[in-house]
Structure formats: structure tokens, C-alpha cells
Amino acid sequence: MNTADRLDLLSRYTEEVVTEDELEALLDGEPTAYIGYAPTGEMHIGHFTTIRKLADFQQAGVDVTVLIADLHAHLDSEKSPWDLLDARSEYYEASIRAMLDSAGGDPNSVDFVRGREFQLDEEYTLEMYRMAAETTLSRTQRAASEVVRQSDSPALGGLIYPLMQSLDVKALDADIAYGGIDQRGIYMLGREVLPDHGGDSPVCLFAPLLSGLSGGKMSASEAGSKINLTDDPGQVEEKIDGAYCPQGEVEDNGVLEYVRFLVYPILEQRGEDFVVERPEEYGGTLTFESYDDLEAAYVEGDLHPQDLKNAAAGYIDEAIAPIRERLTDRPDLLVEAYPESYE
């Protein structure tokens, strides 16, 4: 694979690359990338779309580290209680491994690291104090505004959070920082301050945040707005069937976004097209080689919302089926990580 192909593979299905020139320059060597997940609530299909991208990194010859950011999960308004950090970290790692495997990646080639393995080291701690001394309160709050829970009287942990996330890039020796577009503020802070702390400004790749199935932003607290990794085929079908998906409209259409950012990348990796099966009386089977073709047909009215939903539900269930099987084979993971929900 030449440099142009690798660059295209890495930048596809992203919201933003900062910057493409820097990313291209990295490909002359052996770049490394990292993504971090704070083990808080249950993982869902929104996580799957970002984790699927790790298969692209691997195919492009980029070494990947996944940080299970256990300390971050507690620092952000104690979203995860201290006594549940280990259980939730174990659940997150198992889920991420299953998702990457389902997406065609190799979880055994990923380096999984937990925050407490290095974030309590003396060198890391001293560097964090130095960074805290040099960074203003307003700059820190601005960096974390899309990630950390905000209030009129914020906890100190939420202010330490973006400083640590910036330092994680250096500590993990990552050339590329990858995450959702909501992480942009933190990584822009990292690009500013890391050169003053013995590190390099990372290249940043940002994934889009998907709309919820009810329209608008996906909500972890709204059960019907997302598909869980353990949802059975009937639940997947029911949620997709009830999703906001008005004829011809693309904006805030979670069904189309799932198809674009999850289903199509997996199909492309397999060399398969998106197939919509319909009775002959309703026009017969449709085949779409690219997402752009599918979206155009939807906007023009050649693809009915219900036909799209039926096909999307099948492909999504196929994608999460091996993940669901692994997690249901280990019910202890969810019971121990979320005892209030599974007792």
C-alpha cells in the first residue's frame, strides 16, 4: 500500500484531520496512534463506529494503543465509583476487543493500557503539576467543555482531566491522537502545550458524533436513542423501526449515519455492496456500491425509509452479533461493572 492509499484509508470516515500534511509526513516512518476510553456507562453502537476505525489504522500499518482511562472515569464527577473502576475497565477492554474483531481488525495486535499503570508515576505527576501551573482555568475549562460535565461550581477533577489527557499522548509515545470530535478542545490544548513539556504536537484524527435514533444528539441516558451491544435481533429491529428517519431527509438521521459510518466501512472491507431486498411489486432488490449512491436514492425518493430501515437493521445486527455473543457468554462482566442495573 503506497502513502496516498494509506493516507486515504486513515482519513476516510473522519470529521477532521489536524493536519493532513503532518499525517502524510508521519507515514514516512512507523507511526503510532492511541485512543482513550473512560470506563463509565455501558458501551453502545456509537463506540463501535469509532472502534471500527482502528481496523483502518492497522491496515495502514499504524500501531494502536487503547487507553482504558480509569482515573478519568472517576475524575469526571465520579461517573464511575472508585470501587467499580476495575470491573468497568475489564468490561470495556472485553467489549473493545470484541468490536474490533467484528470490524475485521486484530485485537491481539493492540496494546491495552490502563491509566493507573502510568498516571501515578512520579515523572507523570510532576509534569502534570508543571502543566497545571502554566495553564489558566479558563483555558482548561474551554478545552474540556464538550467532554467533562459542566456546572457553575465544577469539581477540581474535571479541570485536571484535560491536562492528564494531554500528557497521555506523550506518556504513551503516540504520534496520532484519535477520538470523537468532542475531544477536539482537549487535543488542541495538547498540541499547544506538549512541546513545552518534552513532547511533540500530535496529529489528531476526529470521528463524527452520531445522531441518536430519536433525532438529535445520541443520549446515553435515553435507551431508545442508541443500540446496545447486547441488544438481541428483535430489539435492534424494534429500535431501528421506530427511529427518526423522514423521507428524503439526511440531517439528524441516525439510521443513515449508522449505515454510513458503521455498515459501509465493514462492507467495503469485505468487498460487498449494500443490498436492499424488496418484493418485485415494490421495485425489486436494490444494490448500492457506495454510500453516496444510497443517500442520493434516499433523497430522491427512490429508497423508502422502511426499506432502508429493514436493510439497516439486518446489517447492524450482523455486525453486533459476535459482540453480543461474547458479552452474553460472560454475564459476570456486566453484573460486576453495573451492579445497580443487573442485580
Language model regions located:
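Short connector loops at secondary-structure junctions
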Residues: 69-82, 207-212
